[in-house]
Swiss-Prot record:
Source organism: Corynebacterium kroppenstedtii (strain DSM 44385 / JCM 11950 / CIP 105744 / CCUG 35717)
Protein name as catalogued: ATP-dependent dethiobiotin synthetase BioD
Positions of the catalytic residues: K37
Pfam families tied to this protein: AAA_26
InterPro entries for the chain: DTB_synth_BioD (IPR004472), P-loop_NTPase (IPR027417)
Length: 230
């Protein structure tokens, strides 16, 4: 299987834009990226993270499996709406159905690694069920080291393979904390940084984003992603 879980250290750290950037790099190298959002909350049909990736990249291989009305953790939103919880095995099988030779399935989680998607399971559980490695998207400012280290530690304790970190938003003129964090993130987490997304990249034109996305990452990012996800 070629499935990679895109998770984060929390909400609004840049997972969607990072997912789009990884998809662009994969496509440039001849792979067919396919984006899956297991659960979207607080967005009507036709909107949300998967459509945002399509708008940003032009890649229309994107599916949202479940939607819940309020912008909360998926399990909480499902409970409050009296809607059935997504089942782990069902979601895993749906994701596997998108996998095929030459394709890399990017699964964008909701919030952080341990956010409840179903009643009793998280994105970490989904990664383990799929046997899929994860990429952790993190913030880069003050407080980011603790969040990144906690997320990587939680993943490794569960036996998950962490491919690396992506800084979800890096300013043109980073402050002192951000500059220090760029040096310290790989040290405290024991995990490579695969790249940094420029601040505001989610508002770029599709043409600019697709052209510049490969420059966000280390040169061998595609090899790392495809080698570990096979």
């Amino acid at each position: 299987m070629s499935i990679v879980i895109m998770t984060g250290t929390g909400t609004d750290v840049g997972k969607t834009v990072a997912t789009g950037a990884v998809a662009c790099v994969l496509q440039k190298e001849g792979y067919e990226p396919f984006i899956v959002k297991p659960a979207q909350t607080g967005e009507p049909e036709g909107e949300g993270d998967a459509p945002r990736v399509t708008a940003l990249t032009g890649i229309d291989n994107a599916e949202t499996l479940y939607r819940f009305p309020e912008p909360l953790a998926p399990a909480t939103s499902a409970r409050r709406a009296n809607m059935p919880y997504p089942e782990l095995t069902t979601v895993a099988e749906e994701i596997k159905s998108f996998d095929k030779p030459g394709r890399v399935v990017l699964v964008e989680g909701a919030g952080g690694l341990l956010v409840r998607i179903g009643q009793d399971w998280t994105i970490a559980d989904l990664a383990r069920e799929l046997g899929a490695p994860i990429i952790v998207v993190c913030s880069t400012g003050l407080g980011s080291l603790n969040e990144a280290e906690l997320t990587v530690e939680a993943a490794t304790r569960r036996g998950l393979t962490v491919l690396g970190l992506i800084g979800g938003s890096i300013p043109d003129s980073p402050d002192l904390a951000t500059r220090c964090n760029k040096e310290d993130l790989p040290v405290v987490t024991g995990t490579d940084v695969l790249g940094y997304i420029p601040e505001g990249a989610g508002g770029w034109s599709q043409q600019r984003f697709v052209q510049e996305a490969p420059g966000f990452f280390v040169p061998d990012v595609v090899g790392r992603v495809t080698r570990e996800s096979d």
